[in-house]
């Protein structure tokens, strides 16, 4: 039979015939033979031939080598211009056509070519014999894959074992112990089983936020099926996860995707309920394959009839948003699915889940995970990582902390790396000194020789330490690896016990459980006790335990919250609060005390946990420390002044500007950018939010602030909920400043002044807004002695700047008093002080530095004489070096005497 008509062959079979010519030219053969066709078939991506040989237990690489023996026997030519059809290939094609006819197929397909190959005397039989096979064995493998299907279409091969190609058998993975244990979720799994047991519309869809464990529920069902912990209607069923990506990938022509999906569905329906399909991200089914105006049908429409009739049992999983966007808009598809809502587990449930997963992660990473680390992962992730969901974020913390520790174990310890670096430096210095010694005409001086001896001595000592530490590190590392290998074997034996128990082979299960497993556990205990002895001596180089601090470090890396703040107890942090704030905010004892008390109340659990840490309205004249107190709060509570989100409320005077806080509505310019307040807090949820000059904002702004102050949350223009529970909200206002300036000097009138200020507030702000603020704090005008302390703080700032230029600064009390007098103005607070310091200190010092009057190493002395600041520098007395008189030359004596 001449292979000239492609219409007689399937696509894969014809592709192999065409590519066999390239194979023949590659081996420089002039005749096109059976072996070239087989090599071309084996080179096809996801080809049927490779799957058939795999089913017949034939090694693909071994088969390729066997076929190459025949190609090497053929006559070769340096340049193959024309190929000739070999006699054995002609016979093979005739046999393939005969097989097609006897099997009542329309096209010659890959399996027909393989039947012809198996009956070939020159190559086929000899090749199969090398693998202890005969033509009947190959035919059985073909029929096992092909089943009862007929070759009626050119792409028929793609429809064989469609579920194997486009799916993943979860029950088989559960049988092999490849799935993680599923802890809890009993209620959801029972609901899924209940829906699957229905006569029609038996298709549950798992709906929940990303990371709450929807896929885990399907895996839990697979494990229950394997263990027989399901009703009769689900016993011995296969749960197969459909991979929509591989189903769509490579579908180039119209209708190709639909054909693949139909072949999958046909396999499922032909199984008579033995196969349950699991489609993760089921929303991708809706619209998949459909093209506007192309006439092709999307996957959702293909599924509807089978879902409704109960021919197909399918479990879907998708997020709430995707379900709303894609499935709810198609009511015909939605009614065929029964919703099973999967909620986020609590912190306690998450800890239980982590305890169940602990062993898997320990064996994978080769480390130990402490229980306190698991508790920390659940609690810290719940508290500090707000944009993700439990248990996924807690599992990720444990996984990353274990991976980090594993990396430390496999890398050199810090102590050894330090020694290596020091040795490298010394070796370079030694080479330099030795080169100087060998240079002609230049001998090394006495100091160089002494230095060389010291270097050599240090190198010898360090090499000894390096050898000792390196040996210790390698032995500890080896011991940890041995323990991990034993634990892997232990896990394999446990899996064998489970398999034996499922197969009711109690003898085998007992033999492993009370024989091999006990011996292995004893070996592990011995190795671990040896490791504990080394660690107990305090000389260990490697850590093998993931602790609470490791988890905290990972959280710090994710969220930007410094590590020491996470581990510091609330009691220590809050007891230091007032003292720390007073270092930055001079005076204002009442304000600092009120802020500290409110934060202590919130952190001690005496306030609704759904509200922000604290919300304050700071009132007072300009320059008295309102903004500085907000900065100090951010610096202390969050270790960074950058954790303060400052919004100037004078920018929100118009009604339409309010939308800038939470983002423009859909359809308006700037919708994608988000709001200034919502985006800032969403990106940095642990911050001090400063709303400056709040009385200047439009009244509608306060409507938005009401839900922030009361519920600790806000919904931006894109529907995202922004969490304000870990923020401190500080609002500043100048309302009532005239009352504070006129009355605050007299303590007796304080109550009267306070009433007048509050009365002014009530005139401007609505009662529902004022009622939601934790504390209204009045800032007093600054007194002269407080201004003096502020000057001292500012001088320290200048000293830091000068320190970079190696210049020191010293002020007399008179100079300090002069600066205070120059900048004292009760109406404007501390701000005139800053201008006075700039004018009277910074400007003259800057000029003298540029004139080289003050240079590195100088100490600037500043005093006040007759109302003017005098700048001078301290002159250090210079002393000549003492030398013996007999060594002084005549010239030097003359200079000294003069």
Curated annotation (Swiss-Prot):
GO CC terms of this entry? cytoplasm
Instruction: Using the UniProt annotation, give all residue ranges assigned to the region (C-terminal).
Output: 782-898
Q: Where does ATP 1 bind?
A: 208-215
A molecular function GO annotation = ATP binding
- Protein localization: Cytoplasm
Q: Which SUPFAM superfamilies match?
A: Double Clp-N motif, P-loop containing nucleoside triphosphate hydrolases
What the entry lists under SMART domains is as follows: AAA (SM00382), ClpB_D2-small (SM01086)
Coiled-coil stretches: 395-536
Q: Which Pfam family, any one, appears in the UniProt record?
A: AAA_2
**Annotated region (Linker), positions in chain:** 345-560
Q: Which UniProt keywords apply?
A: ATP-binding, Chaperone, Coiled coil, Cytoplasm, Nucleotide-binding, Repeat, Stress response
Q: Which positions does UniProt annotate for ATP 2 binding?
A: 620-627
Q: Where is this region: Repeat 2?
A: 85-148
Q: Which residues form the Clp R domain?
A: 6-148
Quick one: where's region NBD2? 570-781
Q: Where is the signal peptide?
A: none
Q: Where is this region: NBD1?
A: 161-344
Give GO BP annotations, semicolon-separated: cellular response to heat; protein refolding
Matching NCBIfam families: chaperone_ClpB
Q: What is known of its domains?
A: The Clp repeat (R) domain probably functions as a substrate-discriminating domain, recruiting aggregated proteins to the ClpB hexamer and/or stabilizing bound proteins. The NBD2 domain is responsible for oligomerization, whereas the NBD1 domain stabilizes the hexamer probably in an ATP-dependent manner. The movement of the coiled-coil domain is essential for ClpB ability to rescue proteins from an aggregated state, probably by pulling apart large aggregated proteins, which are bound between the coiled-coils motifs of adjacent ClpB subunits in the functional hexamer.
Quaternary structure annotation from Swiss-Prot or TrEMBL: Homohexamer. The oligomerization is ATP-dependent.
* Family the entry assigns: Belongs to the ClpA/ClpB family.
Biological role stated in the UniProt entry: Part of a stress-induced multi-chaperone system, it is involved in the recovery of the cell from heat-induced damage, in cooperation with DnaK, DnaJ and GrpE. Acts before DnaK, in the processing of protein aggregates. Protein binding stimulates the ATPase activity; ATP hydrolysis unfolds the denatured protein aggregates, which probably helps expose new hydrophobic binding sites on the surface of ClpB-bound aggregates, contributing to the solubilization and refolding of denatured protein aggregates by DnaK.
* Name of protein: Chaperone protein ClpB 1
């Amino acid at each position: 039979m001449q292979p000239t008509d492609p219409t007689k062959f399937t696509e894969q079979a014809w592709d192999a015939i065409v590519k066999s010519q390239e194979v023949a030219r590659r081996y420089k053969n002039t005749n096109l033979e059976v072996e070239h066709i087989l090599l071309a078939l084996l080179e096809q991506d996801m080809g049927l031939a490779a799957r058939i040989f795999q089913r017949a237990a034939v090694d693909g690489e071994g088969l390729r080598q066997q076929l190459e023996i025949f190609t090497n026997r053929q006559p070769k030519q340096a340049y193959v211009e024309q190929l000739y059809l070999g006699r054995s290939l002609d016979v093979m094609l005739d046999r393939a056509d005969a097989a097609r006819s006897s099997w009542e197929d329309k096209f010659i397909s890959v399996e027909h070519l393989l039947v012809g190959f198996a009956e070939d005397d020159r190559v086929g039989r000899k090749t199969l014999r090398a693998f202890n096979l005969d033509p009947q064995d190959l035919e059985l493998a073909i029929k096992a894959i092909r089943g009862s299907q007929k070759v009626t279409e050119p792409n028929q091969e793609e429809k064989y074992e469609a579920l194997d190609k486009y799916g993943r058998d979860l029950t088989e993975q559960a049988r092999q112990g490849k799935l993680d244990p599923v802890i809890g979720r009993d209620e959801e799994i029972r609901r899924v089983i209940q829906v699957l047991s229905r006569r029609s519309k038996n298709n549950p869809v798992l709906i929940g936020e990303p990371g709450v464990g929807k896929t885990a529920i399907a895996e839990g069902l697979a494990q229950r099926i394997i263990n027989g912990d399901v009703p009769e209607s689900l016993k011995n069923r296969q749960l197969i996860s459909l991979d929509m990506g591989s189903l769509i990938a490579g579908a180039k022509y119209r209708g190709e995707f639909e054909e693949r999906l139909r072949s999958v569905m046909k396999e499922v329906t032909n199984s008579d309920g033995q196969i349950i399909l699991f489609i993760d991200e089921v929303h991708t089914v809706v619209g998949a394959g459909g093209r506007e105006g192309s006439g092709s049908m999307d996957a959702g429409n293909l599924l509807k009839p089978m879902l409704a009739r109960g021919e197909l049992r399918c479990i879907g999983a998708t997020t709430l948003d995707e379900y709303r966007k894609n499935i709810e808009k198609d009511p015909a598809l939605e009614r065929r699915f029964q919703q099973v809502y999967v909620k986020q587990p609590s912190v306690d449930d998450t800890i239980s889940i982590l305890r169940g997963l602990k062993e898997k992660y320990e064996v994978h990473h080769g480390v130990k995970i402490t229980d306190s680390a698991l508790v920390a992962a659940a609690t810290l992730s719940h508290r500090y990582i707000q944009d993700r969901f439990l248990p996924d974020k807690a599992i990720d913390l444990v996984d990353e902390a274990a991976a980090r520790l594993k990396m430390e174990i496999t890398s050199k310890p810090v102590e050894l790396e330090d020694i290596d670096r020091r040795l490298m430096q010394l070796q370079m210095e030694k080479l330099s000194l030795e080169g100087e010694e060998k240079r002609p005409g230049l001998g090394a001086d006495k100091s160089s020789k002494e230095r060389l001896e010291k270097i050599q001595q240090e190198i010898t000592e360090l090499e000894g330490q390096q050898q000792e530490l390196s040996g210790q590190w390698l032995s500890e590392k080896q011991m940890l690896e041995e323990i991990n290998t034993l634990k892997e074997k232990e896990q394999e034996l446990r899996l064998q016990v489970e398999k034996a128990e499922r197969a009711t082979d109690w003898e085998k299960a007992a033999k492993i459980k009370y024989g091999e497993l006990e011996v292995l556990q004893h070996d592990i205990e011995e190795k671990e006790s040896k490791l504990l002895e080394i660690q107990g001596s305090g000389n260990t180089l490697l850590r093998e335990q993931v602790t609470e601090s490791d988890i905290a470090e990972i959280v710090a890396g994710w969220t930007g919250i410094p590590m020491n703040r996470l581990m510091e107890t609330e009691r220590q942090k809050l007891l230091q609060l007032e003292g720390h704030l007073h270092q930055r905010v001079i005076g204002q004892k009442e304000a600092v005390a009120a802020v500290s008390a409110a934060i202590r109340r919130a952190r001690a659990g005496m306030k609704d946990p759904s509200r922000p840490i604290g919300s304050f309205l700071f009132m007072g004249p300009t320059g008295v420390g309102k903004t500085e107190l907000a900065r100090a709060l951010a610096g202390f509570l969050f270790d960074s002044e950058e954790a303060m989100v400052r919004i100037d409320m004078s920018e929100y005077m118009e009604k339409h500007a309010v939308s800038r806080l939470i983002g423009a509505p859909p359809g308006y310019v700037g919708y994608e950018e988000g709001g200034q307040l919502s985006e800032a807090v969403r990106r940095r949820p642990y911050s001090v939010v400063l709303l400056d000059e709040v009385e200047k904002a439009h009244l509608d702004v306060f409507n938005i602030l009401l839900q922030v102050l009361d519920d600790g949350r806000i919904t931006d223009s894109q529907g995202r909920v922004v969490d304000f529970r870990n923020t401190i909200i500080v609002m500043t206002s100048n309302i009532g400043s005239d009352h504070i300036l006129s009355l605050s000097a007299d303590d007796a009138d304080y109550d009267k002044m306070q009433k007048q200020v509050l009365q002014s507030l009530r005139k401007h702000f609505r009662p529902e807004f004022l009622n939601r603020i934790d504390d209204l704090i009045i800032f007093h005008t600054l007194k002269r002695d407080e201004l003096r302390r502020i000057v001292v703080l500012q001088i320290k700032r200048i000293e830091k700047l000068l320190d970079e230029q190696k210049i020191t600064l010293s002020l007399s009390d008179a100079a300090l008093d002069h600066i205070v007098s120059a900048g004292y103005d009760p109406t404007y607070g501390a701000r005139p002080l800053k201008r006075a310091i700039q004018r009277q200190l910074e400007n003259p010092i800057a000029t003298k530095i540029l004139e080289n009057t003050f240079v590195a190493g100088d100490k600037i002395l500043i005093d006040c004489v007759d109302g003017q600041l005098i700048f001078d520098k301290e002159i250090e007395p210079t002393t000549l070096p003492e030398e013996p008189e007999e060594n002084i030359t005549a010239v030097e004596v003359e200079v000294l005497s003069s």
